[in-house]
Amino acid sequence: MENNNKNYSHYLHSGYAHPITRSWQGDKVILKSQLIYPIFVTDLINTKTEIKSLPGQYQISSDLVVEFLRPLVEKGLKSIILFGVIISGVKDEQASSADKRESSPVIKSIELIKNEFPEILICTDLCLCAYTDHGHCGVLTEEGFIENEKSIIRLGEIALSFAKAGAHVIAPSDMMDCRVGQIKKVLFQNGYGGRVAVMAYSSKFASSYYGPFRDAAGSGAKHGDRQAYQLPIASRGLGLRAALRDEAEGADFIMVKPAGPYMDIIREVKDHVKVPVCCYQVSGEYAMIYHASVAGGIDLKSGVMESLISLQRSGCDIFITYFTPQLLDWLKL
């Protein structure tokens, strides 16, 4: 006689046997509007150079950035984040090249992009490391230590320059204490508080996955490292504390960086903050997936999509990824 005492709730296959019912099992689909593409803009002229450690990514002079973006905009690109790269200009202790129009590739690029593609959301990375002669993310004391208060004042000045040029989102990546509050104060004092958002690199860890990026941005520290201000990789508590602090100081968006190895932090942050959470799939993550596909270890599209769906499942709302050009081809909406 057949046993009718089965617990049918343990049988799962029927709930995802059809493509449509499979789609119902996920919370969301990833949209093109959730993607932010990182762009490295240089102070050179008429130059586009592939970054060896980031295949398929380029350092682009600001005069070429519009034509570089045009085919991506036609495919549905909605958002970018600009990183300045000083090659021919001067780097100094105060990061002077960051906010002088004649020397800042970011300011020049903002103006050009905004004029040609007014619908594009322009985010600007905000840090001193790419512009200082020592390569650290803040102003240093004579002894070589970070001077936090002077650093956040300088960051506020640069943020205001980016806002005046037309940036929509300022994204401080420096990891100075309390810089979000200083940036928000400067923006409000100058009439930009209600128009320019702050996306804080809040839970940013002192990761080994940043290597290709530092090649791209020319932002490696000349001495020491950044472990005194970027978060310890083992610390879950600091990851949450930094996010809660930045939210309390007025951050409109919170970022976790890197992404894949820190999905527990993404979930923790998502469960505690009331603002959207962004994750940065950093250069080392990109390189691993890219080279695994080149070696035949994984299918590129499947690997990229799985990585982003996993990040979304962990709580990510916005994705900064170097795979954006491919995703614009793969995603329908």
UniProtKB/Swiss-Prot annotation:
Residues binding Zn(2+), per UniProt: C127, C129, C137
UniProt-listed Enzyme Commission number(s): 4.2.1.24
Cysteines paired by S-S bonds: none
GO biological process annotation, one example: heme biosynthetic process
Enzyme class: lyase
SUPFAM superfamilies: Aldolase
Chain residues that bind 5-aminolevulinate 2: S283, Y322
Residues forming the catalytic site: K204, K257
Subunit structure: Homooctamer.
Protein name: Delta-aminolevulinic acid dehydratase
Gene name per UniProt: alad
